[in-house]
Regions:
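Aromatic-lined, polymer-binding surfaces characteristic
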Residues: 26-30, 35, 42, 49, ...
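Hydrophobic h-region of N-terminal signal peptides that target proteins for export
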Residues: 9-17
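Non-catalytic terminal regions with compositionally biased, polar/charged low complexity
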Residues: 623, 632-770
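A surface-exposed beta-strand-loop module
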Residues: 604-626
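Terminal, non-catalytic domain-edge segments
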Residues: 19-36, 44, 253-254, 272-369, ...
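Positively charged n-region of N-terminal signal peptides that target proteins for export
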Residues: 1-4
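Polysaccharide-binding surfaces and accessory modules of carbohydrate-active proteins
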Residues: 548-603
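Catalytic and substrate-binding regions of extracellular carbohydrate-active enzymes
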Residues: 316-563, 570, 621-636, 645-653
Length: 770
C-alpha cells in the first residue's frame, strides 16, 4: 500500500502542470532516493571499504582521508529513524559512528609524525567539508535516547578530538571554508553541549558564523557560491534559525541573483573557480528548494525543478553524496508551490556594486539565446577577510577569493541549445596550473593589456623592416608575450550603462588598471534580429607608455576561416564530447594596424584555440585604440561568407572620436556606433554644462551626434533610431533630435551667461525617411 501511495504522489504533478512547464520533483522522490541510496551503500559496504583500502593514499597532501559514503549513509538512516522509528535504521547509523574511528589506523605512524597538525593524533574526522555528517546522526540518536552512556562517551570523544583539530587551522571571513567550519561547530555545540571544550567551540562558532550571517560573500565563483549557501543552510539548521536566515536581506538577494543568472543549460553558468561539468548544481538545488519555500516563490521553485530535472538521475542510487543533499531537499522544500518560469529578459544581475553581471537573453528555455558578461572586481568589501587569506595561503593567482581575472569577460554565450563561448575552467593542479591556469586574464574572452610593445615581425611583402626583398619575418607569439606566472593584479570596474529595448540591448562597462596605466571600455550590443552581437573594445592610456593590447576569443575548433573571420565550434567541453547544434562566426571588421593569430592552448582541461587580434604602440596620455568584434551564431550547415559582405566597419571622420559597424540585411540596414572617449566633450570647468555639442560631436558615415551610443535601422521609407546621453543627432544631414536649451546659472567664473543645452538620457523615435 505504501508503494502505491508513493506512485500516486509522483504522478500528481503530471496532471497539475501544462505541457510546456517544468515538472517539480515531489519531496517524497527525494526521500525515497536517499533511502534507496543508503540501502545500496549498506549492502555494498564491504566492497566499498575494500576499494578504499586498495586506493588509500598515505602521501595525500590532505593527510588522512577516511572512507567516503558511510557518513552520508549514517545521516540518512538516522533521519529516517527520526521520521519513522525503524530500529534497524538506527542500528545501522550507530554502527557507522562506533566503527569510524577505527579506520584511521590505516594511516602510517611515519606519516603522522611528519604532519605538525597531527601532534595530538590523527583525527577520525579530518575534513570540515563532511565532519558535520558524523555529528548530525549522533544528534538524532542521542536525542531519541538510542545510545548507551558508554556509546555516547565514545562518539563524543571522536567529535571533540576532530572539532579541536578543525580549530588548529584558521580560516575565517564570508566564504565557503569559513562557513563550513561554522556549520560543523554549530552541530558540535548542539550535539555535545556539556563537553569541557564546548565553551571554546561556541566562541569560534559565533566568530565564524557572525562573519557569514547577513554578510556579502567575498567569493566570485559558481562552485563555491553553492558550497557557501549550503553551509549557511546547515549552520542555520543546526541553530534552529532557518527562518531567521531567510529574513536577512542578503539571502533574499542571493536567491534572486542566482535565479536570474540561470542559463539555457539548466544551471548557473560557470565563472571564477568552476567548470561546466561540476558547477555544484546539487547544492544549488537544495538552496533553491529551501528558498522557494521560505519566500513562497514559484520562480525559485522553477529554478529548483529545472536543475533537478536536468541533472538528477534517480536510477543511480550509488550516488550517496547526492542522496545526502537530496535528503535536505526533502527536509527544507515544499510541495505546495507550482513552478513559474521567470519572464524578465535582458537585465543587470543584480546591480553594479555587488553582483556586477549583465545577462542578455530572449527567453528561459533550453533553446533561448543567452550571454553573460562578468565585470565583478575584487571590490572594497571584506578587506580583512581577503587580506587574511592572501597572507595565510598560496592564492596569488586568485581574485580574492576563488575569483579570476575575468573582469569584462564574456563567460557564456549560448544559442539554440549550444554553448558557443564558455569560461576557462578552474585549475588543472594546485595552486594553479601553468601561467596561472585557468585564472589569469588570457584564459578569458576579454581584452588583455601589457606594458611594452610586442615584436610584430612582418608578412611577406610588408615594409616594416629593411630587407629589400621584403621577406616574411616571424613575429612574437602574442600569447607568449602575455604569459606570466598568472598572479592576479588588482583592478577596478564600473558599469557605465545598460539599456534594453525590443530591437537591441546595450551595455558599457569599464575596467581601470591604475598600476599598468590604462582603462578599457567594453560595449556590447545585441542586435536581436538577426541575433548577432557587436562588441566594441576601447583601450585608453592613462600614462605615457608603450603598450600592447590583445582582443582574445577562445574556442575548441576552427571549422573554416578567411580574411579576418573564423567559424568556430565547441565539440567538447572539459575534454568530454559535446554535440553542438550551432557554430559561432567570429569576425573582426576593423583591421588597420591590427595583427591576428591563431594559437593552440591548454584551457578548460582540454586542447583549445585562442584567436587574437592585437596591436602595440606608444601611447600619449589619454590616447586610445579600438577593437571591433562581430559574434554571429550560425546553423551547422550555414555558410558564413555572406555575413562578411554584410558587415562593415565605419570609422568616424576624425579617427579616434567614434566607431561603428554597418549591418546590411535584405530589407534594412542597421548601424551601431559609439563614442570612444566619453570625456572628450569636457572643455570647460568654469560653468555648467562642462560640454558643448561641438566639443562632443563625431561623424560615422551618415550619422552625426554627440551621443555615447547610437543605433539606427533604415528601410526604404523609414528610419528608426536610438541615441543615448545626447544633445543632438543627425542622419544624412536631417535633424533627428535636438535637446532644447535651459537655464544654467551660478557660473563659477561669475559671468551672467545662463544659456546651456543639457543631454537627454536617451531618445528613440521612428520617422519617414526615403
Amino acid at each position: 500500500m505504501k508503494k502505491l501511495w508513493i506512485v500516486i504522489l509522483l504522478l500528481l504533478p503530471l496532471f497539475a502542470q501544462g505541457a510546456d512547464d517544468v515538472i517539480p520533483i515531489p519531496r517524497v522522490e527525494y526521500l525515497e532516493f536517499a533511502r534507496a541510496s543508503a540501502d545500496w551503500t549498506w549492502d555494498n559496504r564491504d566492497s566499498l571499504l575494500t576499494l578504499w583500502r586498495d586506493n588509500f593514499d598515505e602521501k595525500s597532501i590532505f593527510g588522512y582521508r577516511p572512507p567516503p559514503r558511510f557518513l552520508e549513509m549514517a545521516t540518512i538512516y538516522a533521519t529516517l529513524y527520526d521520521y519513522e522509528g525503524n530500529i534497524e535504521y538506527a542500528n545501522r547509523a550507530k554502527q557507522v559512528l562506533l566503527d569510524y574511528s577505527e579506520y584511521k589506523k590505516m594511516y602510517p605512524k611515519k606519516e603522522e609524525k611528519r604532519r605538525p597538525d597531527y601532534t595530538n593524533g590523527v583525527p577520525a574526522l579530518p575534513d570540515f567539508f563532511t565532519n558535520m555528517r558524523y555529528i548530525r546522526p549522533y544528534e538524532v540518536l542521542k536525542r531519541k535516547g538510542f545510545l548507551s552512556d558508554s556509546e555516547k562517551k565514545e562518539i563524543e570523544k571522536v567529535i571533540a578530538h576532530s572539532i579541536d583539530y578543525v580549530l588548529q587551522s584558521q580560516e575565517w571571513g564570508a566564504m565557503n571554508r569559513s562557513c563550513l567550519r561554522a556549520e560543523a561547530l554549530a552541530w558540535a555545540v548542539r550535539a555535545v553541549p556539556d563537553h569541557p571544550h564546548t565553551k571554546y567551540w561556541k566562541s569560534y562558532e559565533r566568530a565564524l558564523g557572525f562573519d557569514n550571517w547577513g554578510n556579502w560573500e567575498i567569493e566570485d565563483a559558481t562552485i563555491y557560491h553553492g558550497v557557501w549557501l549550503y553551509a549557511l543552510l546547515g549552520y542555520a539548521d543546526a541553530k534552529n534559525e532557518s527562518k531567521e536566515l531567510f529574513h536577512t536581506p542578503e539571502m533574499y538577494y542571493y536567491a534572486q541573483y542566482f535565479l536570474h543568472l540561470m542559463c539555457p543549460d539548466g544551471m548557473i553558468p560557470d565563472f571564477g573557480d568552476s567548470h561546466r561539468i561540476q558547477p555544484n548544481w546539487s547544492r544549488f538545488l537544495v538552496f533553491f528548494e529551501a528558498a522557494a519555500k521560505a519566500y513562497d516563490d514559484p520562480e525559485l521553485k522553477w529554478a529548483a525543478a529545472t536543475i533537478g530535472r536536468k541533472f538528477v538521475d534517480f536510477s543511480k542510487v550509488q550516488s550517496i553524496g547526492l542522496a545526502y543533499l537530496l535528503l535536505d531537499c526533502y527536509r527544507f522544500g515544499t510541495d505546495d508551490l507550482n513552478p513559474a518560469q521567470p519572464t524578465i529578459l535582458s537585465e543587470e544581475v543584480m546591480e553594479d556594486v555587488q553582483g556586477k553581471k549583465i545577462v542578455f537573453r530572449d527567453g528561459w528555455d533550453s533553446k533561448s539565446s543567452y550571454m553573460m558578461l562578468n565585470y565583478r572586481d575584487e571590490g572594497d568589501g571584506g578587506v580583512i577577510f581577503r587580506d587574511y587569506l592572501r597572507d595565510a595561503i598560496p592564492v596569488e593567482e586568485e581574485k580574492m577569493t576563488h575569483g579570476h581575472a575575468d573582469e569584462g569577460g564574456i563567460c557564456r554565450l549560448m544559442h539554440d541549445g549550444t554553448i558557443l563561448l564558455v569560461d576557462g575552467g578552474y585549475r588543472d593542479y594546485m595552486p594553479s596550473g601553468m601561467y596561472g591556469a585557468f585564472r589569469q586574464d588570457y584564459f578569458h574572452n576579454r581584452l588583455c593589456v601589457r606594458q611594452g610593445k610586442i615584436w610584430m615581425g612582418q608578412e611577406a611583402g610588408e615594409w616594416r623592416y629593411s630587407p629589400t626583398d621584403h621577406p616574411k619575418i616571424e613575429g612574437q607569439s602574442i600569447i607568449d608575450y602575455l604569459h606570466n606566472a598568472g598572479s592576479y593584479r588588482f583592478v577596478r570596474t564600473q558599469k557605465i550603462d545598460f539599456l534594453t529595448f525590443d530591437d537591441f540591448d546595450y551595455c558599457r562597462t569599464k575596467l581601470i588598471d591604475d598600476k599598468l596605466g590604462y582603462q578599457w571600455d567594453r560595449v556590447v550590443t545585441w542586435v536581436k534580429d538577426p541575433g548577432i552581437y557587436i562588441v566594441f573594445d576601447v583601450m585608453k592610456a592613462t600614462e605615457e607608455e608603450w603598450m600592447t593590447a590583445a582582443n582574445l576569443w577562445h574556442t575548441r575548433k576552427i571549422l573554416d576561416q578567411g580574411d579576418h573571420w573564423y567559424l568556430t565550434q565547441y565539440d567538447s567541453l572539459t575534454n568530454k564530447k559535446y554535440d553542438p547544434e550551432s557554430n559561432l562566426l567570429i569576425y573582426f571588421p576593423e583591421t588597420h594596424y591590427r595583427l591576428e593569430s591563431v594559437e593552440p592552448e591548454k584551457r578548460n582541461y582540454q586542447n583549445e584555440i585562442v584567436i587574437s587580434q592585437y596591436t602595440g604602440q606608444h601611447f600619449e596620455l589619454g590616447e586610445h585604440i579600438g577593437f571591433v568584434t562581430a559574434l554571429i551564431p550560425q546553423g551547422l550547415d550555414e555558410d558564413p561568407r555572406p555575413w562578411i559582405d554584410r558587415i562593415s566597419f565605419i570609422d568616424s571622420d576624425n579617427p579616434g572620436d567614434g566607431m561603428s559597424v554597418e549591418i546590411k540585411l535584405d530589407k534594412q540596414t542597421i548601424q551601431v556606433g559609439m563614442k570612444r572617449d566619453m570625456r572628450m566633450d569636457m572643455v570647460r570647468d568654469y560653468r555648467r554644462p562642462k560640454y558643448t555639442y561641438e566639443s562632443g560631436k563625431y561623424n560615422c558615415g551618415k550619422v552625426e551626434t554627440n551621443a555615447d551610443f547610437f543605433y539606427t535601422e533604415k528601410t526604404k521609407k523609414k528610419l528608426s533610431f536610438t541615441v543615448v546621453n545626447v544633445s543632438k543627432a543627425y542622419y544624412d544631414g536631417k535633424e533627428l533630435f535636438a535637446q532644447l536649451p535651459s537655464q544654467f546659472g551660478l557660473a563659477f567664473d561669475g559671468s551672467s551667461s545662463e544659456y546651456g543645452i543639457g543631454k537627454a538620457r536617451y531618445w528613440r523615435d521612428e520617422i519617414d525617411f526615403k
